[in-house]
Curated annotation (Swiss-Prot):
This is 1,4-alpha-glucan branching enzyme GlgB 1. GO terms for cellular component: cytosol. Pathway: Glycan biosynthesis; glycogen biosynthesis. The keyword Oxidoreductase does not apply. Keywords: Carbohydrate metabolism, Glycogen biosynthesis, Glycogen metabolism, Glycosyltransferase, Transferase. Catalyzes the formation of the alpha-1,6-glucosidic linkages in glycogen by scission of a 1,4-alpha-linked oligosaccharide from growing alpha-1,4-glucan chains and the subsequent attachment of the oligosaccharide to the alpha-1,6 position. PANTHER family: 1,4-ALPHA-GLUCAN-BRANCHING ENZYME (PTHR43651:SF3). It is an enzyme of class 2 (transferase).
Length: 724
């Protein structure tokens, strides 16, 4: 039998470095019919079972595990393998032809395969009547790729893959491997050096950390029951609809006996709470698989796999489905800017800078010690866009909040002179990222109508929410970081000094209509030594709670969608700790319960009155009444809806001094109802107010023929609307 084996081939197979196993293994034409070769390290014997049941014993080769024998020129066969522990009969992986179509490979190469995980990754399929899993991975510079797993003792010699040369995709159909199998890819770089075993970049399921293997996902699709939600989603998420977002970290919203809830447990507890509180959406901090829990998900590696920390992918689908059935939208934080350097991940995936830039001046982020995606490479931008579509289409997610957009837009982001590479025109803008974001948002709008894309963008980059056709980036909304920074700084000042910083309260209206905004009080504002939202407020306990209530009243009546991080809705006094659950016991304290009740009522007020949301992006929806009373730290403004909607008057006193008969001009006479007062006793306030209503007097003020003499409670926000 020695003439059947070339010594160089034997050595390459034995050392797991043969780059074209299909040229050697499997059945190939011979003078006597077909010569079948197999390499099954650890096997004692191998036979070929022909279609008629005849068994052809294969002869052992020059290396343990090598077997060869002559078969008839035609007909199928199966392998009967004798292992030390028993016998196995299976199809030969090397009996099957190429798996992926040329069209699939073309789309992958062009970065246009929107269902990328249906082509790459691990897909349970049936080929020529045989069930198994097709593995496929993009690694164009690898000299050899093998799939290893619990089905082959993690032995890279067992299942070397086929290279589809023009695309750089390696593929192999492995019979009898099904859902639940753990696997990785074992690659050699372009010069033959062995690389760390890699998790599948396109895996739909991952092993629970600290494990790093990928898992063959169950192909059974989730049976959705959210048709009603999906049919009305576009209207529910339109620009003139209310959007109040409750941002959560799934692992620390509620911990019972120190244990994370799974998706079903979270749905049982979170969904009724969110519905009762009146939020329209939940926003999940990243749920893509990530190796380090302390990154809160913002350094993901499994961009197609919901993290195993909270259960299976179908568990995540059930969570979204249940949210939709209760009328709650689901937004997911998504990270296309950078990825961690973990050896099992994307870093130097095939021995080259494949997903990242090769030059650290473009490819390494020193702030986070992460690698930066090369958005200018078609396959990489296509990989990221397909990840977005995976969550939007497969999991019915209603929107993505795109993380760290500013870090992507500017080549000199957080870099000193000489530490970055200018664009082709010598500037700082990252043209490749701009093109990527525009295409991402165009694809989302075309293929998932009604879904929303939200940018966390902290600079004045123009046109973030302008349409791509008009030169914009195409996002639906942008976080208003300027409003957040200015107003939080103002709210943190002792009231005696606020008169000198009045502009921080009013400046946001100068640019309020330059973009479509979300007002974010996010997790970033309650970590890294910043303290809690309540902890930022000055004064004694009474003043701190009153300040918080007034600030929330200002937030919920200011133009822009709302986002509030978990714990802020009841005045958590300490910074958020991702290793612990929220301090729910504080709701036994009437002060914290009062803040929670206030947020619940603000959400209902915000949804109930179209004037508070219908014209968030239209200057006609807002008018200052009092914007210049810095001495008293008072602001007053009108919110207006569409024709026929009642106007809403908002007045906020940011000092602890009660203002008596503070006169505010209003556009119409008659009685005005006080529909909200942050100083109400039910919220923990002193119960000072206007007795439920005020009658306008014929005394001109602020450009109006009539006015209201109001009592402004200390550190209080009141909202009034005319009767009828």
């Amino acid at each position: 039998m020695s003439n059947r084996w070339d010594s160089g081939v034997v050595r390459a197979l034995a050392e797991a470095r043969h780059g074209d196993a299909f040229a050697v293994l499997g059945a190939h034409p011979s003078d006597k019919g077909r010569l079948l070769r197999t390499y099954l390290p650890g096997a004692d014997r191998v036979g070929a079972v022909l279609d008629d049941g005849q068994v052809v014993a294969l002869d052992a080769g020059p290396e343990p595990g090598l077997f060869a024998g002559e078969l008839p020129a035609h007909g199928g066969y199966r392998l009967r393998i004798g292992w030390p522990g028993g016998e196995q009969e299976t199809a030969d992986p090397y009996a099957f032809g190429p798996q992926l179509s040329d069209f699939d490979l073309h789309l992958i190469s062009e970065g246009h395969h929107l269902q990328l995980a249906d082509a790459l990754g691990a897909n349970v399929v049936e080929v020529e009547g045989v069930r198994g899993t097709r593995f496929a991975v993009w690694a164009p510079n690898a000299s050899r790729v093998a799939v290893v797993g619990d089905f082959n003792s993690w032995d890279a010699r067992r299942h070397p893959m086929r290279l589809r040369h023009q695309s750089g995709v390696w593929e192999l159909f492995v019979p009898d491997v099904g859902p639940g199998a753990h696997y990785k890819y074992q690659l050699r770089g372009p010069h033959g050096h062995e690389l760390p075993a890699k998790a599948d970049p396109v895996a739909r399921r991952a092993e629970l950390a600290p494990g790093t293997a990928s898992i063959v996902a169950d192909p059974t699709p989730h049976q959705w029951s959210d048709d009603g939600w999906m049919a009305t989603r576009a209207r529910r998420q339109a620009h003139d609809a209310p959007m109040s977002i409750y941002e959560i970290h799934a692992g620390s919203w509620l911990r019972e006996a120190g244990v994370d809830l799974d998706w079903d447990g979270l749905a049982d507890r979170l969904i009724p709470y969110v519905a009762d509180m009146g939020f329209t959406h939940v926003e999940l901090m990243p749920v893509s698989e990530h190796p380090f829990g302390g990154s809160w998900g913002y350094q993901p590696l499994g961009l197609f796999a919901p993290t195993a920390r909270f259960g299976t992918p179908d568990g995540f689908a059930r969570f979204v489905d249940r949210c939709h059935r209760e009328g709650i939208g689901v937004i997911v934080d998504w990270v296309p800017a950078h990825f961690p350097t973990d050896a099992h991940g994307l870093a130097h995936f095939d021995g080259t800078a494949l997903y990242e830039h090769a030059d650290p001046r473009e490819g390494f982020h020193r702030d986070w010690n992460t690698l930066i995606y090369n958005h200018g490479r078609r396959e990489v931008s296509g990989f990221l866009i397909a990840s977005a579509m995976e969550f939007l289409q497969r999991y019915h997610v209603d929107g993505l909040r795109v993380d760290a957009v500013a870090s992507m837009l500017y080549r000199d982001y957080s870099r000193n002179a000489g530490e970055w590479i200018p664009n082709i025109h010598g500037g700082r803008e990252n043209y490749e990222t701009i093109a990527f974001l525009r295409r991402l948002n165009e694809v989302v709008r075309e293929h998932t109508p009604g879904a929303v894309m939200i940018a966390e963008e902290s600079t004045a980059f123009p046109g973030v929410t302008a349409e791509v056709a008009h030169g914009g980036l195409g996002f639906h909304y942008k976080w208003n970081m300027g409003w957040m920074h200015d107003t939080l700084h103002y709210a943190g000042l002792d009231p005696i000094y606020r008169r000198y910083h009045h502009g921080e309260l009013t400046f946001s209206m100068v640019y309020a209509y330059s973009e479509r905004f979300v007002l974010p009080i996010s997790h970033d504002e309650v970590v890294h030594g910043k303290g809690s939202l309540l902890g930022r407020m000055p004064g004694d306990d009474w003043q701190r709670f009153a300040n918080l209530r007034a600030y929330l009243g200002f937030m919920f009546t200011h133009p822009g969608r709302k986002l509030l991080f978990m714990g802020c809705e009841f005045g958590q006094p300490t910074e958020w700790n991702h290793d612990a659950g929220l301090p729910w016991h504080l709701l036994d304290d009437p002060r914290h319960r009062g803040v929670q009740t206030l947020v619940r009522d603000l959400n209902r007020l915000y949804v109930q009155y179209p004037a508070l949301h219908a014209h968030d992006d239209d200057p006609s929806g807002f008018a200052w009444v009092v914007g210049d009373d810095a001495g008293n730290s008072v602001v007053a403004f009108l919110r207006k809806g569409k024709r026929g909607d009642a106007p809403v008057l908002v007045v906020i006193n940011f000092t602890p001094v009660v203002q008596h008969a503070y006169r505010i001009g209003v556009p119409q006479g008659g009685q005005w109802r006080e529909v909200f007062n942050s100083d109400a006793g039910i919220y923990g306030g002193s119960n000072l107010g206007n007795g439920g209503s005020v009658t306008a007097e014929q005394q001109s003020m602020h450009g109006h023929a009539q006015s209201l003499p109001l009592l402004l409670p200390p550190l209080g926000a009141i909202v009034l609307t005319p009767y009828g």
